[in-house]
Amino acid sequence: MKKIGLFGGTFDPIHNGHLHIARAFADEIGLDAVVFLPAGGPYHKDAASASAADRLAMVELATAEDARFAVSDCDIVREGATYTFDTVQIFRQQFPSAQLWWLMGSDSLMKLHTWKKWQMLVRETNIAVAMRQGDSLHQTPRELHAWLGNALQDGSIRILSAPMHNASSTEIRRAGVSDGIPPAAARYIREHGLYEK
């Protein structure tokens, strides 16, 4: 059975931490592919600094060297707010017999119960969690306790041994383009004058 990982994010800009966790996701779960999904209008985050087209281009450039990585614009081309459940449904239709895995950080796991159709989402896809420094499953909200206990037992949620990278896109934007960005994406940023103060 084919295993496909889905990695959604604003990627504003994509950085080496994203690539590191995507590789760990692929390795630890045994994925055939990791599909990067740049957000169009992210529901749970503030507006992006770079346009959707620029963020898509940077992700395509940054992921080109790993044959396991693919990029989809499905969250960009959809009208209105994009929700994870709807994105997973698109991939479920494209790959009906595949095992789908959604990658999220532990910060997102703590808010999962606020996501649209979250209970249906966790029936449609497995969840891989990259823990952020200082986070613990003991901090999980009460609304998720029963589901989390069952999911840990049946293997439909996996906690990755690779921690989430400390770098954030916000910090990288504030500091300016640095070593934390893949060279092809850094070149694109310079050539297009993105994130200039």
UniProtKB/Swiss-Prot annotation:
Signal peptide: none annotated. Its EC number is 2.7.7.18. The keyword Transferase applies. One of its GO terms (molecular function) is ATP binding. Keywords: ATP-binding, NAD, Nucleotide-binding, Nucleotidyltransferase, Pyridine nucleotide biosynthesis, Transferase. InterPro entries: Cyt_trans-like (IPR004821), NadD/NMNAT (IPR005248), Rossmann-like_a/b/a_fold (IPR014729). It catalyses: nicotinate beta-D-ribonucleotide + ATP + H(+) = deamido-NAD(+) + diphosphate. It is an enzyme of class 2 (transferase). The keyword ATP-binding applies. Pathway: Cofactor biosynthesis; NAD(+) biosynthesis; deamido-NAD(+) from nicotinate D-ribonucleotide: step 1/1. GO terms for biological process: NAD biosynthetic process. Pfam families: CTP_transf_like. Belongs to the NadD family. Catalyzes the reversible adenylation of nicotinate mononucleotide (NaMN) to nicotinic acid adenine dinucleotide (NaAD). PANTHER family: NICOTINATE-NUCLEOTIDE ADENYLYLTRANSFERASE-RELATED (PTHR39321), PHOSPHOPANTETHEINE ADENYLYLTRANSFERASE (PTHR39321:SF3). This is Probable nicotinate-nucleotide adenylyltransferase.
